[in-house]
Amino acid sequence: QTVSVDIGSTWTKAALFAHEGEELTLVNHVLTPTTTHHLADGFFASLNQVLNVADARPLLKSGEVQLKYSSSAKGGL
């Protein structure tokens, strides 16, 4: 599985995709407020929610889930 997270100026978006051969299927997606005072808070809130877990870090460390991330914010962060 792959999770894509985009940190925007207002919203942090996360989407979970399943790999089926060369096809990707959207499994889940969430939208959470961007926490401009500490970006990691909103980032991990989105990540945990899209994976439906309390702490996504073990899944990332084990390689069970791949992570792709970006920022579409225009200034301000």
Question: What positions do the PLM features span?
Answer:
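N-terminally biased helix-coil "hinge/interface" segments that flank
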Residues: Q1-L77
